[in-house]
Structure formats: C-alpha cells, structure tokens
Amino acid sequence: MEEKVSTLTLRKFKKEGRKITALTAYDFPTAKILDNCGIDMILVGDSLGMVVLGYESTIPVTMEDMIHHTKAVSRAVNRAFIVADMPFMSYHISKEQAMTNAARLIAEGGAHAVKLEGGEEIASIVKAIVDAGIPVVGHLGLTPQSVHQLGGYKVQGKEKEQAKKIFNDAKVLEQAGICALVLESIPMELAKNITENISVPTIGIGAGPYCDGQILVTHDMLGITQGHRPKFVKQYADIEKIMIDGINAYIKEVQQVLFPDEEHSFTLEKRENK
C-alpha cells in the first residue's frame, strides 16, 4: 500500500514539482472511491452546506455538521490527507474557542488538518492552533464565509491594492505556520507570484495552472450539482444523467412488473419425494 500523505509529503511534492490532487468528500462511499483512485488530499468542506444540505451558502453549517461528515470520510480513507473546514464563527471569538473546535475536528472527526479562511486578521489564531500541534491549511482570495462582505461570489485580487493584500496575507499565514494554502478565484498571475514566493504548497480553485495543486468540488466536476456551475469548473462526467436514466428504468420496470424477476427473487426449497 502507498504511504499515507502527510504535511511532509505535500512539501515534498512542491519541492519535486509534482502536482497535488485534491477533491471534496462528505460521505463514506465517495471518500472511499477518491482514496482508491489515489487522490492526495480530501477536503471535507463547509461547501457541504450547499452541496448536500441544501443551504444557500456555507454560513449555516455548524461544528456538529462538520464533525459528523468528517467522521464518515475518515472511516473510508487509508492514504489521502484529510482536511476539515472550520465553519463560520467557529474560530472568530477567541483563541481558546478556535483551539477547542480545531481539536474536535481532529480527535472526534478524524481529520489530519483544519482549514481556516482569512489572512492577517486570523494569523494569531492560526499560530495558536499550529502551536497546539494541529496542522492548519489557509484559504485566501474568494472566502465563501465572507461572501456577504465581498459582495457575492466574485474574482478577488484583480485590483493592485487587493492583489497586494492577498500576497501579504499569504506571507503572514506562512509565518504563522500553515502547512498549505488554498487560493480561490484569483488571477493566475497573482497565484503564480504567491506560489513562487512561499515555501508551503498552494492549492488552486479558480486560480490558474501555476499553483502546486488543484481542488474542485467533486459534485461539480462529476456533473451532480444542479444550477450554476462556476467558470473554473471542468465537468469530467455526467453522473446526474446516469442517475436519472437508472432511476427511470427502475420506475418503469416496477410499474410493468418486470422487476423483481425470478433472478432477483427467492423460492421455497424443493423437497425430495420420499
């Protein structure tokens, strides 16, 4: 069996120029498939709020939601590095609150690292969690928990001052001890500049080809998600169509009494005549 992916593995991949692969999972069977395929990193994202719980944003997602889904994923995984999102307001009140919640995702959920959104304003919290022995992944650019403050799901860092802030935030988070950095919806030139100037791996989502790795929401790239698909998503399969075809075939066969047939039914044992 391949060696488990760790923070050291991720740094090694960056140093060697080997691209890191990452996708999301929120349940046991999906995580098992991803792990068996050899994905390097699995994110149990608070995106589960929109993808599987039906919320309009990530903001209503709770710590209990995150622990519940992280547990399911961690039971399935043998090799991949599991990162769990810290949900909205689970690390903003105090360092003590942040460390307690981060510890729960590791100890109860089975995650290997936690992910926090934000830059310089959360650097001291990141450092406190790292100093407690918990690996932290940073997240800059479009940060969904701040979607109302950002004015919607828009590309960040297009203007010079904004780009400078994102770059500086990346350096500050590196100093705070992050093990990796997610860059979301920023110009590829900015992502390239950050990637070349920090020692930790960058994982891009809508950040161009120059990051050390890439992540997408699994439901988006497999064609399960309904509604708007972001520009940066490439759809690799149409699982929704496969599901619809299968379900419609089942409905038809049940209604026409074609299922269950003899092959899928049980019969009484035939007794030998005495």
Curated annotation (Swiss-Prot):
- Function, in words: Catalyzes the reversible reaction in which hydroxymethyl group from 5,10-methylenetetrahydrofolate is transferred onto alpha-ketoisovalerate to form ketopantoate.
What cofactor requirement does the entry state? Mg(2+)
What GO cellular-component annotations does this UniProt entry give? cytoplasm
- Return the HAMAP family for the record: PanB
**Which keywords accompany this UniProt record?**
Cytoplasm, Magnesium, Metal-binding, Pantothenate biosynthesis, Transferase
The record's active-site residues are 184 (proton acceptor)
Quote the record's cofactor note: Binds 1 Mg(2+) ion per subunit.
Q: What is this protein called?
A: 3-methyl-2-oxobutanoate hydroxymethyltransferase
**Where is this protein found?**
Cytoplasm
